[in-house]
């Protein structure tokens, strides 16, 4: 587990990158926040030691992209209908 200083530094340094990647892939603020928390939780619990800042940044990018893809492939995501689509449909009798 990482120290609070390491986590705060990583959040300060990579939060913008993680959020932007999420928004590009998910186009949804709520899902972006969920993945953001997931990525940084993985970082906190990870015991990976990084060779350099570039290696650490690459880890954040890869973990973020993978988490976004996992969410997009998930059963829950594939079985939901956005509310705005339901509002546009005529009522079924």
What is the role of each PLM region?
Residues 13, 25, 62-63, 71:
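Conserved catalytic core of Hanks-type protein kinase domains
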Residues 30:
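Residues within helix-turn-helix
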Residues 34-41, 54-66:
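Structural recognition of an alpha-helix C-terminal capping motif at a helix-to-coil junction
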Residues 38-39, 84-86:
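Short acidic/histidine-centered micro-motifs embedded in hydrophobic/aromatic stretches
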Residues 86-93:
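Acidic, proline/glycine-rich intrinsically disordered inter-domain spacer in sigma factors
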């Amino acid at each position: 587990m990482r120290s609070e200083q390491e986590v705060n530094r990583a959040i300060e340094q990579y939060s913008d990158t993680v959020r932007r990647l999420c928004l590009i892939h998910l186009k949804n603020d709520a899902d972006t926040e969920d993945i953001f928390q997931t990525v940084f939780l993985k970082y906190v619990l990870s015991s990976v030691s990084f060779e350099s800042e570039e290696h650490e940044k690459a880890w954040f990018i890869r973990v973020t992209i993978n988490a976004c893809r996992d969410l997009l492939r998930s059963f829950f995501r594939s079985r939901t209908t956005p509310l705005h689509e339901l509002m546009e449909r005529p009522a079924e009798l």
